[in-house]
């Protein structure tokens, strides 16, 4: 059922109107993964990986959506049984995996970006995988399980150390951004506390005015309230600005940048794999390097 839904999704994505940017997108993709030709051994696999990127990850600048999100938004013509699966595809996991264990009909892999392990139903597990293989792949959720799309970019033995070192750079950057986000949230929490104190002070003074009959005392309290109101407005504005700043930072640095860094690394590694595929007597270490 997952494969049927994926095939249906691809069929829609490469047809009008979703295919309008296909050629432009291919140029964007090959800028990082290298230009591919029909006589390349991995041509079909790479074209399949390109289509996955086009559907699941490329943002259409005019809509600020992926092709997948656009298809879901305009889902009137999609059969309901397939639409249910396609909606789940939003939670796909694109990553660099290492094979931990191979069984008849299944494989256990670990996502090197998160260290999370997955037991995947894979009838051809012994044909596709070998223990300690490092590869790029995409997991699609279906019910309570995950399935690979079947399109992979396998990296040669001897590249694991380099790949892990590149992943570590991304994770270090992510931790730095998360630390900064935590600091921003702490700052905002303190500012809201100050605002709440000011608001409570104003409320207490307003309640006090009601209980007093002395005009002089009333005017004195009202003067205090008048002095606190502009302070409250400034504090409210500051809190709103901090909220907006945190929202933007979370979207750009935590979500988008984190995802983009991973994608760019996988594309860079795919290009290195292509160079290795075409190479003649070139040491692997001279390809998988910065």
Functional labels for PLM-detected ranges:
Residues 138-145, 152-155:
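Short, charged beta-turn/beta-strand-edge "cap" motif at the junction between a beta-strand
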Residues 16, 20-100:
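Accessory interdomain/linker segments of ATP-dependent helicases and helicase-like nucleic-acid enzymes
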Residues 122-138:
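Short nucleic-acid-contacting surface segments enriched for D/E, G, S/T with interspersed K/R
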Residues 105-109:
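Short aromatic-glycine-enriched beta-strand elements
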Residues 149, 164-211, 215-290:
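C-terminal effector modules of nucleic-acid-centric enzymes and ribosome-associated factors
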Residues 101, 111-113:
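Acidic, low-complexity intrinsically disordered regions
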Residues 158-163:
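Short helix-loop boundary/capping segments
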Residues 116-121:
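A short macromolecule-binding patch
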């Amino acid at each position: 059922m997952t494969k049927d839904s994926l095939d249906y999704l691809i069929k829609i994505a490469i047809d009008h109107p979703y295919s309008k940017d296909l050629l432009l997108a291919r140029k964007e993709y090959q800028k990082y993964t290298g230009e591919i030709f029909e006589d390349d051994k991995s041509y079909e696999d790479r074209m399949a990986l390109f289509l996955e990127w086009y559907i699941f990850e490329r943002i259409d600048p005019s809509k600020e959506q992926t092709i997948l999100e656009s298809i879901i938004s305009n889902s009137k013509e999609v059969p309901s049984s397939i639409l249910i699966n396609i909606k789940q595809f939003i939670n796909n996991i694109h990553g660099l995996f290492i094979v931990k264990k191979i069984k008849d009909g299944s494989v256990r892999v670990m996502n090197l970006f998160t260290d999370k392990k997955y037991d995947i139903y894979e009838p051809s597990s012994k044909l596709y995988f070998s223990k300690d293989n490092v590869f790029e792949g995409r997991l699609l959720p279906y019910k309570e399980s995950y399935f690979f799309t079947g399109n992979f970019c396998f990296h040669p033995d001897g590249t694991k150390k380099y790949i892990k070192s590149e992943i570590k750079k991304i994770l270090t950057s992510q931790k730095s951004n998360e630390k900064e986000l935590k600091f921003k949230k702490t700052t905002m929490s303190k500012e809201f506390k100050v605002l709440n104190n000011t608001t409570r002070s104003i409320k207490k003074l307003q309640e006090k005015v009601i209980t007093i009959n002395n005009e002089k005392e009333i005017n004195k309290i009202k003067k205090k309230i008048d002095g606190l109101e502009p302070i409250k407005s400034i504090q409210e504005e500051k809190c709103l600005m901090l909220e907006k700043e945190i929202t933007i930072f979370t979207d750009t640095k935590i979500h988008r940048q984190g995802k983009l860094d991973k994608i760019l690394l996988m594309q860079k590694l795919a290009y290195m794999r292509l160079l290795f595929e075409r190479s003649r007597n070139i040491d692997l270490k001279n390809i998988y390097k910065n």
